Amino acid sequence: MNPKHWGRAVWTIIFIVLSQAGLDGNIEACKRKLYTIVSTLPCPACRRHATIAIEDNNVMSSDDLNYIYYFFIRLFNNLAFDPKYAIDVSKVKPL
C-alpha cells in the first residue's frame, strides 16, 4: 500500500503519542504504542525499514523521551519525499 495515502496520518499519530508521553511521563506505554504502530504499517518495506531503524538505534531500551522524540523526527526527515515537509530540528523544543 502506498505511503502517500496513509503516511501523514500515521506520522501525526506518532507525534501525538510522543507528545502525550511528554505530558503524562509514561515512556514505557509510549514505546509500546509506537512499536505497535510501526510494526503494523500497511507497507511491508516501510514496516521493515522502521523496525530495523528502531532496533539499530536502541529506541525500545531508551528511557529518554527526547532521544525517542528526536529519533522519530530524524526518521521522518529521512523519509520525507519533499524537503519542504522536513522538520527543522533547531526549532523543535524538547518534550
Swiss-Prot record:
Protein task: FAD-dependent sulfhydryl oxidase that catalyzes disulfide bond formation. The complete pathway for formation of disulfide bonds in intracellular virion membrane proteins sequentially involves thiol-disulfide transfer between OPG072, OPG128 and OPG088.
Transmembrane segments: 9-25
Assembly and oligomerization: Interacts with OPG128; this interaction involves formation of a transient disulfide-bonded intermediate, allowing disulfide bond transfer.
Any single Pfam family the record assigns to this protein: Pox_E10
Recorded family membership: Belongs to the orthopoxvirus OPG072 family.
Subcellular location: Virion membrane; Host cytoplasm
Domain ERV/ALR sulfhydryl oxidase: 1-95
Protein name per the record: Probable FAD-linked sulfhydryl oxidase OPG072
Keyword Nucleotide-binding: no
The reaction(s) this protein catalyses: 2 R'C(R)SH + O2 = R'C(R)S-S(R)CR' + H2O2
Disulphide connectivity of cysteines: 43-46
SUPFAM superfamilies, A to Z: FAD-dependent thiol oxidase
Needed cofactors: FAD
GO cellular component entries: host cell cytoplasm; membrane; viral envelope; virion membrane
EC class of the enzyme, as a word: oxidoreductase
Enzyme Commission number(s) from the entry: 1.8.3.2
Induction comment from the UniProt entry of this chain: Expressed in the early phase of the viral replicative cycle.
Keywords carried by this UniProt record: Disulfide bond, FAD, Flavoprotein, Host cytoplasm, Late protein, Membrane, Oxidoreductase, Redox-active center, Transmembrane, Transmembrane helix, Viral envelope protein, Virion
Residue numbers on the Intravirion membrane side: 1-8
GO molecular function: thiol oxidase activity
Virion surface side: 26-95
